Amino acid sequence: AMAEGYENLIRKYQVEFYPDYVQIRRRVMDIKDKIEQKAAKKVPCHNDPLCENWVRGEGRIFLVDWEYAGMNDPMWDLSDLSIEAEYSRQLDDELLKAYLGRNVSEEEHFRFQANKIFVDFLWSLWGKARVPFGGTEMEQYAWMRYNRMKQNLSKI
């Protein structure tokens, strides 16, 4: 639903879509359909856990800026954290094992990788929708997200 909202804004502001967007979008939606057939339990998620939203204070760590919070696959937050903190494959595995409290199943690993794609797909659209207000910087941000999403798409 959020992707469609950003797509509508991109059209409204007459920002150019990515040249291969139609094909890439179809592949992303096919993966999304495959994931949704397994019906991962939705839980309350932050949906924007970039490093700047983690604040240390009073001997604890707080997660702030909950404007995008909602029900989602928990793998979204874990995938987003991995992307934003530039985790290696080893750190990804440690993160998942710590979160789950056990070894990761193939299905869970697939969901994690798929959510990395979904995260960058959505933020690449957000960036494009912000181009009229952020210019070249937003265009570069959008392309960085889109290209990384395509790299991850080629691995799945």
What is the predicted function of each stretch?
Residues F110, A114-F118:
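Start-of-helix signal in alpha-solenoid helical-repeat scaffolds, especially tetratricopeptide repeats
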Residues M149-I156:
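Regulatory N- and C-terminal appendages and interdomain linkers associated
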